[in-house]
Amino acid sequence: MATIAELKAVLKDTLEKRGALRQIKARIRAEVFNALDDQSEPRPPLCHENLLINELIREYLEFNKYKYSASVLTAEAGQPEVPLDRQFLVKELNIVEDANGKSVPLLYGIISHFLHRGKEESTQSTLPKVSLLSYPRQNLAKPSTERNQKDRIPEPGRMAGTSIEEPLVLQSIKR
């Protein structure tokens, strides 16, 4: 007859081989986070750029089946429960997708574009080089369409947004 220690070892090994142990641990971490999250303390509103960045990350996490990581990101960042529409993201980020690129997260296409840009010497979609020191703090009270370029420096702890003059053309990638 097997000992309790042997049964534990076999159970752990089986769960690891199936990938279930990793899922169980992630689920426990997400549940602990949700239990400890203080809902009474209001979160500061997300700036437009952080909302878009978080949405790109959420799309990536959900595509890769990191659902507990995505739920923690949504809760911790104060992201809306309902994901933003992909077409909205494409329009806001001034991205042009080819038909094959729609099957993977936008983040894959963005990364692929910049990894291969040097090889193809495209003048399209070059991010402007901006010195953050020369701009005042961002005016978050205005919608992003009303902010001018000098309002682009973020508050401490927030990411700076960049604007793309030409559309970012994403082509299909092999994953």
From Swiss-Prot:
Domain LisH: 49-81
Alphabetical list of Pfam families matching this protein: FOP_dimer
Predominant place of localization: other
UniProt keyword annotations, A-Z: Cell projection, Cilium biogenesis/degradation, Cytoplasm, Cytoskeleton
Bias type Basic and acidic residues, positions: 144-155
Gene Ontology CC annotations of this record: centriolar satellite; centrosome; ciliary basal body; cytoplasm; motile cilium
Subcellular location as annotated: Cell projection, Cilium; Cytoplasm, Cytoskeleton, Cilium basal body; Cytoplasm, Cytoskeleton, Microtubule organizing center, Centrosome; Cytoplasmic granule
Keyword Cytoplasm among UniProt keywords: yes
Superkingdom field: Eukaryota
Cysteines engaged in disulfide bonds, as pairs: none
Coiled-coil blocks: none
Family the entry assigns: Belongs to the CEP43 family.
UniProt subunit comment: Homooligomer; probably required for localization to centrosomes.
Protein name: Centrosomal protein 20
Organism: Gallus gallus (Chicken)
Protein's gene: CEP20
